[in-house]
Amino acid sequence: MRYLSFRKNSQIIAAGLLLADTNSILDLSHQSCIGLLGNTQPNLLDMVKLGLEPISKRIKESLKNDPPDKDAVIELKDVTFCAPIPNPGKIIGAAYNFTDALDERSLPYPKEPVIFIRSGLTTIGPYDPILIPPDVGNVGYEAELAVVMGKRALHVEPDVVMKLIAGFTAHNDVSGSGMIKEDKGNFVRGKNMPASAPFGPYLVTPDEIRNPYAIDIQLKVDGKTLQDGSTAKMYFKIAELISFISKQMPLEPGDIIATGTPGGLAMVHSPPAWLLPGQMVQVDLPGVGFLTNPVKQGVPYFEQ
């Protein structure tokens, strides 16, 4: 199933489900759907915490037996998407985790996963602008497959990891490469610029993904292909990666793991393909999601 978060009005973000026609969604906050969600609110993070599997089962049975209430159906063209998990507790990224990206820069393969933490406050959704702060240069793109945790993970072994996953989504791990270089490889500043972590449009449940290591990853800037790779080049696979992270810190439902990016990074192009205000970036992971974001300069406004 393909879940989403969408904005109903300026105050309310609700959960939805892409319907079989792929042209409309089911508004899970509609009164006709409340009984399908169990004892939780119609937002995707709460649903993940309760457990998406039983919710999905109830929804499938309901749709099989009866068509949805027409007032609960919204045409896709009228939906304002948010990130599937708009406020994740934390985002853990994997650096240096695709062999083609390492090979093109003549970098050694790491002996263990190299990870960094992003604030959940860097999250934005489809069509939201990627914001480049004033006086910050050398900002790069990184198209990635992201994993949303469905259950707590602490000191877990690889053989149980896939049972703990709620789903997958597309991600652009926008990075201040200039700051990372200035900080001698420290990721904190370069990976935590506000409005620099697009996700979406959907949280795709694991049963929809036949093989997570056979997903094409493509990124275009203004229509020009700059990354064209595959999760087949992932060095530390999902189970091994999440197991490693769980032995460094607890992972909670709704936390997001960004699994790394293929070759074609901005610095390897000639001239370097750093992101610039006015550009349009598209991330395409067939079967997972197509993510589009404009690039602007500025800082976001946070309401108090």
Regions found by a protein language model. Name each.
Residues 96, 118-120, 134, 141-145, ...:
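Short, structured patches in soluble enzyme cores that scaffold and shape functional sites
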Residues 18-19, 108-126, 141, 276-287:
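Structural signature of FAD isoalloxazine-binding scaffolds in flavoprotein oxidoreductases
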Residues 2, 90-91, 144, 256, ...:
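Residue-level marker of beta-strand positions
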Residues 86, 93, 140-142, 252, ...:
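Residue-level recognition of short, solvent-exposed, well-ordered loop/turn junctions
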Residues 4, 81-83, 103-106, 130-139, ...:
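A generic local secondary-structure boundary/capping motif
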